[in-house]
Amino acid sequence: MCDDDETTALVCDNGSGLVKAGFAGDDAPRAVFPSIVGRPRHQGVMVGMGQKDSYVGDEAQSKRGILTLKYPIEHGIITNWDDMEKIWHHTFYNELRVAPEEHPTLLTEAPLNPKANREKMTQIMFETFNVPAMYVAIQAVLSLYASGRTTGIVLDSGDGVTHNVPIYEGYALPHAIMRLDLAGRDLTDYLMKILTERGYSFVTTAEREIVRDIKEKLCYVALDFENEMATAASSSSLEKSYELPDGQVITIGNERFRCPETLFQPSFIGMESAGIHETAYNSIMKCDIDIRKDLYANNVLSGGTTMYPGIADRMQKEITALAPSTMKIKIIAPPERKYSVWIGGSILASLSTFQQMWISKQEYDEAGPSIVHRKCF
């Protein structure tokens, strides 16, 4: 598939935290970079340094010390279209090195997003990048494809949004979708806050990236939160150290599991919402009684925020406590779940049966951006 023939479709999973992009038919994305646009916060004095007024992705990340970093996608919704266009431009021309006008493009979106978001995406793809065809798929549905199932309930949690999507025989059940605007970025913010209690101050947008790294390397989900807190209080067995970029070493203890515990107890950050185990259960209970058994047996985790060690065991324990006692409950945590949305997109876009699903440039010209609601689930 990779002789990059004229027609290979592009798959671009625009997450709130990471952009995953590549070619349909590949088994992993070619480009994975942060969804960041950085602008200098200082005056340039060196002439001929080729300083730019904005940096995207990894380059912004590496120069973060002198930049103000902004994420154009918040809670799965694109809030800054000019920056988003920069990110897409960077994806096509610098990362994948393709001409978008030659490739059909599959984009992804969180469920229950505002309709306008999807229309504007469609408009930019056709009018700015002149793609020949495009499609917008729901992220959780793609994750289920990637796990090789057609029935299951997906818990997809990324950097910006967490949602439970029950899918039966390939149909998402929109009335039972639960969306929780609590995800990786909120956990990073919370970790910044509780590290301050230890006397470590992290405030700038660049320092937030350091905390995100601490979170990804050291945090885990406790099977029993109260027990773990007691253990942490009585011994130092749970403490780990982390070296900051300037060589200073900091120690973190109970923060390691207090941070992701927020997923199960959103009240930690003042959110009046059920935890991810309850939203999963509530979502199943909103489905028809006949299909619940199949959903309980196929809880699929997807997205970077489900990568914490211990999260699958904890989900198993919590859902078992809520469900009927005889129910068989299975949590599926594929090792590649960080990219399963992208992998599902790659599978979908390379299916021969999918080829009639694309929205073509011609259809767009005739109907305008609203066609996306008719053609894409």
UniProtKB/Swiss-Prot annotation:
Pfam short name (any one): Actin
Q: Which UniProt keywords apply?
A: Acetylation, ATP-binding, Cytoplasm, Cytoskeleton, Hydrolase, Methylation, Muscle protein, Nucleotide-binding, Oxidation
GO MF assignments: ATP binding; hydrolase activity
User: Which of the residues bear the PTM N-acetylaspartate?
Assistant: D3
Q: Which residues carry this modification: Methionine (R)-sulfoxide?
A: M46, M49
Task: Return the InterPro entries for the record.
Answer: Actin, Actin/actin-like_CS, Actin_CS, ATPase_NBD
Query: How is the protein altered post-translationally, as described in the entry?
Result: Oxidation of Met-46 and Met-49 by MICALs (MICAL1, MICAL2 or MICAL3) to form methionine sulfoxide promotes actin filament depolymerization. MICAL1 and MICAL2 produce the (R)-S-oxide form. The (R)-S-oxide form is reverted by MSRB1 and MSRB2, which promotes actin repolymerization. Monomethylation at Lys-86 (K86me1) regulates actin-myosin interaction and actomyosin-dependent processes. Demethylation by ALKBH4 is required for maintaining actomyosin dynamics supporting normal cleavage furrow ingression during cytokinesis and cell migration.
For this UniProt entry, what's an example GO CC term?
cytoplasm
Modification N6-methyllysine, positions: K86
Which domain of life, per UniProt? Answer: Eukaryota
The keyword Nucleotide-binding is annotated on this UniProt entry: yes
N-acetylcysteine PTM sites in chain numbering:
C2
Q: What is its EC number?
A: 3.6.4.-
Give tissue specificity per the record: Predominantly expressed in heart. Lower levels in skeletal muscle and skin.
The subunit structure is: Polymerization of globular actin (G-actin) leads to a structural filament (F-actin) in the form of a two-stranded helix. Each actin can bind to 4 others.
Q: What is noted besides the main data?
A: In vertebrates 3 main groups of actin isoforms, alpha, beta and gamma have been identified. The alpha actins are found in muscle tissues and are a major constituent of the contractile apparatus. The beta and gamma actins coexist in most cell types as components of the cytoskeleton and as mediators of internal cell motility.
Name-wise, this protein is Actin, alpha cardiac muscle
